[in-house]
Each structure stands twice: as structure tokens, then as C-alpha cells.
Amino acid sequence: MQGRTPLLETLRELECEIRLLTVYARECCGCYEILRRKLDRLSGLIGEDCSRAQWQADSDDPALQALGLRLRDAAVQALCELEKHLCQGVLHEPGEMGRYLGSLLESIRGELDSAGIDADARVLFVGSGALPTSALVLAREVGAHLCCLDIDEEALGCAREIARCQGLEARMQFSSLPPAELAFSRDATHFLIASLVQQKSAVLAQIRQVMRADAKVLLRHGSGIKGLFNYPVEPAELDGWRVCAERVSQPLYDTLILEKAGR
């Protein structure tokens, strides 16, 4: 019990602070910077060896697991709000955003190489959000064509404006329609499902209906302590799919590369 108290208490404090700051930031923009630092703190904890070891040691503790679920919900909501706020700054400094995107290319290089994403790729990105950095990198640095999906119309509006400011309108389109209702889905070479998408099995089922036989799915997810900031994928959700490349591990999330089983 003594070994788990520091992590439990730290996560409890973070959950409370993140929830309060998310509310306060809607009234006072100055709170967004504090909120960003709290989310950075959570990201840092996830990457710390001692935190990972402590989480693993106490993984069966119901109190820790329940807190983890609450913290994840708070963090996901906070990140969505923060991205919309950050979007305004990005629109005023398009040059800075361009340099930032260039620096991000190496961080997703493992996913690109494992899935075979290049300039000829057509990628449907599910759960792209207001600040779809991965999609922007693929369009700007790789030259791929993308369709970004999100159920949040406000987030789509933000992302659309960023794409316009970066001169990427010809390579990026945006929609709130389900994957099964998009013509783009039938021609897509790749499907990228964001780690913040909760209903991964439902999205996979829709994609399966319309995807071409040789298309691949990049499924970002979080398990263990990475689940504090990302939704997991359960083994049963992968029925009918085959893992076709080695899992790509990032500090905050992991990526499975999938194709239809029985090809």
C-alpha cells in the first residue's frame, strides 16, 4: 500500500486540477496555459519508468483503475478544448506551425514505414480533432491526400482553417460523416484511427464494410499506464483482423497495423 500512495495521490490531484481548469479556461483564457502544463505533467508521468513500474505493480488495485478511467475522461475533454484554443494562435503564426510540422515527421516515421504510407497514399483519419498534427504532417511533409473525420463540427472548422493557412486545401478534406458513408473510404489506401477514439470496434466495423482489400488500418491505442491519456483496444475488437506489422510504440501510445484477415 505504501508504494502505491504517491502515484495514486498525484493522479488524483491531476484529475481534480484538469477538470477545474477545463471549466475555468472557458471563462478566462489565461487558464489554458496552466491547463497545458497539467496535461504535459500527465504526459511526463506516463513516460517515467518509475510511474510505469508503480502502475504495473498496482494494476489490480480497483481504486487506481477507477481513478485512471476518470482521469482519462478528464484529460481527453481537456485536450479537445485546449486544441481549439491553440488553433487560434496557430492561425496567427502559420510559419511557426510549418516549422513545427517539419520537426514532427520523425516522430511518426515508424508508423509511416510500417504501414507503407507515402506520397501516393490516401488516408482516412478518424478522430482528427481541432489540431490534427499527424494529418498535417502527412499532407505537408509526405504529400499524401487525407480526409479528416470528426464528430465535433467546431473542431473540424478549426482544422479546416489551419489546413487553409498552410496551403493544404488541395490535399486535405474534412467531414463529420461516418466512414461507411464517404466515397473517400472506398479509395483509401490507409485508415488512421486516433488514440482518443473511444468506440474503436464500431469504427473498425464501419471501415471493414467499405475498405479495399489491400488497405491497411493504423490503430492507435493506449494500454497500461498509457491508457491514462488514450483509449485501449480489447483483443475481441480485433476479430476478423490480422496484425501485419510489428507494433509501433510511442511514448504516449502504441499503434497496431492491421489488415483484413483471410486476404
From Swiss-Prot:
One Pfam family this sequence matches: NAS
Biological processes annotated in GO: nicotianamine biosynthetic process
Gene3D superfamilies noted in UniProt: Vaccinia Virus protein VP39
Annotated InterPro entries: Nicotian_synth, SAM-dependent_MTases_sf
Entry annotated with the keyword Transferase: yes
Key words, A-Z: S-adenosyl-L-methionine, Transferase
Annotated EC: 2.5.1.-
Gene Ontology MF terms: nicotianamine synthase activity
Induction: Is part of the operon cntOLMI that is negatively regulated by zinc level through the Zur repressor, which leads to transcriptional activation of this operon under zinc depletion. Highly induced in response to airway mucus secretions (AMS) treatment.
Catalytic activity: L-histidine + S-adenosyl-L-methionine = (2S)-2-amino-4-{[(1S)-1-carboxy-2-(1H-imidazol-4-yl)ethyl]amino}butanoate + S-methyl-5'-thioadenosine + H(+)
Similarity section: Belongs to the methyltransferase superfamily. CntL family.
Function per UniProt: Catalyzes the nucleophilic attack of one alpha-aminobutanoate moiety from SAM onto L-histidine to produce the intermediate (2S)-2-amino-4-{[(1S)-1-carboxy-2-(1H-imidazol-4-yl)ethyl]amino}butanoate. Functions in the biosynthesis of the metallophore pseudopaline, which is involved in the acquisition of nickel and zinc, and thus enables bacterial growth inside the host, where metal access is limited. Therefore, this enzyme probably contributes to Pseudomonas virulence. Appears to be specific for L-histidine as substrate.
Protein name, per record: L-histidine 2-aminobutanoyltransferase
Organism annotation: Pseudomonas aeruginosa (strain ATCC 15692 / DSM 22644 / CIP 104116 / JCM 14847 / LMG 12228 / 1C / PRS 101 / PAO1)
Gene coding for it: cntL
